[in-house]
């Protein structure tokens, strides 16, 4: 399983959030019907996880709660028909449901506990560190890692499969959570082996699922696989474009890439469609991936940004959403100050609600959302600041300026996103010479200099206030001190401060 002398393992924790909730309740994660979702929101809320036994009924791992409700109703209607018209007690256990057809399918709805999931994920990462050094582990997400295990196989006198199984069983003993693994001769192949192959292989005697791929076995086993969206980095947009020209599989992509210049299907066709990203698509179609672990560890982005976004619980009016935008801008400023970063460019994106088009009174530009519904096109605007700063006043004024001039006040609002771009460290700015101030013939230089001094004094006072707020929040919690606007109707900061990643902590 080595190409150019490298062997990689990817490990994915099975239905991680749902498994944590099952273990906390003393239930079997593999046989308990459970979804992780905030039922206090509407049934449109997204399920963060669905347990394997519930997925077996055809429920997506990222379903909306109402989709789970509807699908379970359908399943129970079919069970009722087969049982002669009556179903008795509900059961959330797959074994009980299989043995007793008269029982109705039930399921548990567990509210998210993001802090708990982070704690368990850290515990599992520490298990991996017993076997692999941190420089050879890439944490891909809260429930997924990739490892370069090349130098460890000889040390442990193990095959890659044996090492993967050893770590998975250790995680199971430590936390009760099961995992699947993919082994490959490069990072792409180990990821695809885990994502696609491991789900379909038979578990071994210990219940562990591990799949292996090299370039040749990848071509033999997955060149005809559908859908394309199962492959790493191929989203719905890519798949739709490829299918529009008759390309449905990775094998089709590979064949297209070696077409002659005078043929319709050739490499140039892919580059015209996807630009430079076609190179990665073609490499992956052939099972190639030049990126190594040291490349990931050495990577530093050319530009940095901080983004804050939220989906509102219900449609907000222009004025009500403006209050939330102010809260978000102030939070972004505090975040920058805490990280000792400054920005001179801010971007605001506002998404409108579906209700704006429901009555047929809206006649502006529309787009189609992922559910095929027509909604007003989002508003997007950028504000450039005269100097790099983390001042809440400067950032808030700039963002609200974009909001007031760009957003349609007649439309109800559902999504808000603020991005602080072109970030640099405070110390970097302090070392740069100040930009000269341009005066004209009619300016009173003394007055202008006085204004600049007053502005500097205001910024220093504001910074002290912001630093004091940060200290209070760190000691007593994020809600220990809030701006007055956060107590008004429609404000969201107080509730969001209790969340991690937009979900209950």
Regions found by a protein language model. Name each.
Residues 1-286, 290-293, 441, 446-505:
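Gly/Gly-Pro- and Ser/Thr-rich, intrinsically disordered tail segments characteristic of DNA damage-repair
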Residues 3, 10, 230, 238-413:
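DNA-contacting surface of Y-family translesion DNA polymerases
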Residues 14-16, 40-44, 352-357, 423-426:
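Short, charged/polar surface micro-motifs in flexible loops or helix N-caps
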Residues 146, 384, 417:
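Short aromatic/hydrophobic contact patches that present stacked aromatics
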Residues 185-188, 283-285, 342-354, 412-424, ...:
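A glycine-rich phosphate-binding loop feature that marks nucleotide/adenosyl-phosphate handling sites
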Residues 358-362, 427-433, 494:
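Short conserved micro-motifs at the rims of enzyme active sites and ligand-binding pockets
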Residues 401, 405-471:
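C-terminal hydrophobic structural anchor segments
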């Amino acid at each position: 399983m080595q190409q150019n002398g490298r062997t990689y393992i990817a490990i994915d924790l099975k239905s991680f959030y749902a498994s944590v909730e099952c273990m906390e309740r003393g239930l079997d994660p593999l046989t308990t019907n459970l979804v992780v979702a905030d039922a206090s929101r509407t049934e449109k809320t997204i399920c963060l996880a669905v347990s394997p036994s519930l997925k077996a009924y055809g429920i997506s791992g990222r379903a909306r709660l109402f989709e789970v409700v509807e699908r379970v109703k359908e399943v129970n209607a079919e069970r009722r028909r087969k049982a002669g018209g009556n179903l008795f007690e509900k059961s959330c256990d797959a074994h009980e449901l299989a043995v007793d057809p008269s029982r109705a399918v039930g399921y548990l709805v567990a509210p998210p506990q993001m802090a708990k999931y982070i704690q368990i994920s850290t515990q599992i990462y520490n298990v991996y560190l017993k076997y692999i050094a941190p420089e050879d582990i890439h944490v891909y997400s809260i429930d997924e890692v990739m490892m370069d295990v090349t130098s460890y196989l000889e040390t442990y006198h193990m095959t890659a499969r044996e090492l993967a199984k050893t770590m998975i069983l250790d995680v199971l003993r430590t936390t009760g959570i099961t995992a699947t693994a993919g082994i490959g001769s490069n990072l792409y192949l180990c990821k695809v082996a885990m994502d696609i192959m491991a789900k379909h292989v038979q578990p071994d005697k210990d219940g562990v699922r591990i799949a292996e791929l090299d370039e040749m076995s990848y071509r033999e086993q997955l060149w005809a696989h559908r859908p394309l969206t199962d492959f790493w980095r191929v989203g719905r947009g890519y798949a739709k474009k490829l299918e529009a020209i008759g390309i449905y599989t990775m094998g089709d992509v590979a064949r297209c890439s070696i077409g002659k210049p005078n043929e319709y299907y050739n490499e140039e066709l892919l580059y015209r469609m996807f630009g430079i990203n076609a190179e990665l698509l073609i490499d992956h179609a052939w099972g190639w991936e030049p990126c190594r672990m040291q490349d990931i560890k050495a990577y530093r982005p050319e530009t940095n940004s901080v983004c804050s976004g939220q989906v509102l619980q219900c449609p907000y009016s222009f004025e009500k959403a403006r209050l939330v935008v102010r809260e978000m801008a102030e939070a972004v400023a505090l975040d920058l100050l805490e990280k000792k970063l400054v920005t001179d460019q801010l971007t605001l994106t506002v998404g409108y609600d579906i209700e704006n088009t429901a009555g047929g009174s809206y006649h502006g530009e529309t787009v189609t959302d992922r559910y095929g519904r027509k909604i007003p096109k989002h508003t997007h605007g950028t504000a450039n600041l005269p100097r790099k700063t983390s001042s809440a006043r400067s950032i808030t004024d700039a963002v609200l300026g974009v909001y007031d001039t760009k957003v349609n006040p007649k439309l109800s609002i559902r999504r808000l996103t603020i991005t602080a771009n072109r970030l640099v460290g405070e110390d970097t700015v302090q070392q740069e010479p100040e930009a000269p101030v341009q005066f004209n013939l009619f300016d009173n230089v003394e007055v202008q200099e006085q204004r600049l001094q007053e502005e500097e004094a205001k910024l220093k006072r504001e910074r002290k206030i912001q630093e004091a707020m940060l200290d209070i929040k760190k000691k007593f919690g994020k809600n220990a001190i809030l701006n007055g606007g956060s107590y008004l109707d429609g404000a969201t900061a107080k509730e969001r401060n209790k969340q991690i990643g937009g979900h209950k902590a």
